[in-house]
Amino acid sequence: HVDAAWGGPTLFSPRYQGLLDGIAQADTVTLDGHKQLLVPLGTGMLLCRQPDLMMTVKREAPYAIRASSFDQGRFTLEGTRPANALYLDAAFQLLGQQGYAQLIDANYDRARRMAELIDAHPAFELMSAPVMNLLSYRCIPPHLQGKALDEAANEQINAFNVALQKAQRAEGHSFVSRTQRAVSRYGTQPLTLLRAVLLNPLIEERHIRGLLDDQLRLGSLIASQLFDPTQQQGPVV
């Protein structure tokens, strides 16, 4: 099985489809149209090489269609069908493979440009080079920039990025989500990371720069409130 819920549309891009080499060997593939195919929420698909594989996830409800019923209809993961497939069909009629390829290429290129801007600034730490159009990074408070980071320092940075993400969301001018995971260079310690998703086809570099500028501005304010300016050793108590 291949979970291609997010990355599946990469196949439409001649430039990037090599990232999914081998997917044709899968027995089943999941794909969410409401992500990179830009159609309404709930357009999820399970693609099966052999249709009878659907029988392995079959469930009969005793109050509806039973095995002895005359007409069981088509097997499906949905009960009442909202016809979301029409959204997908309309999008393909409008954009086609070439249109989706242009969107995929542009978004993946934007993610790489954002990664370059992050990597070039001492106040940010890029966790890894983006493969598609998702990237994770974190903002480093001024007193820890350019220093070797141990577990205690990472705990300070975690608290700093939680506060930063909340402040940016509350301000309402720009937004990224946050996540938590271990990064190999820091061992098994969970790190709080900022998570950017480059999906809107109308995003330009000026928007990306504006988002990062917002984080720098808010980060400076938060650092002055969160950390002791005289010792710079940890959160103010």
Language-model segments: which ranges?
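Catalytic PLP-binding core of fold-type I/II PLP enzymes
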Residues: 1-14
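A glycine-rich phosphate-binding loop feature that marks nucleotide/adenosyl-phosphate handling sites
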Residues: 5-6, 61-63, 106-109, 128-138, ...
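Active-site C-terminal subdomain of aminotransferase-like
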Residues: 12-16, 21-122, 128, 143
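C-terminal, well-structured subdomains that either form a transmembrane helix-short loop-helix hairpin
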Residues: 30, 107-108, 118, 127, ...
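Generic non-transmembrane alpha-helical segments
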Residues: 113, 117-121, 163-172, 214-225
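Conserved PLP-binding catalytic core of the aspartate aminotransferase-like
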Residues: 126-168
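PLP-dependent enzyme catalytic core of the Aspartate aminotransferase-like
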Residues: 147, 185-237
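Conserved PLP cofactor-binding pocket of PLP-dependent enzymes
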Residues: 167-190
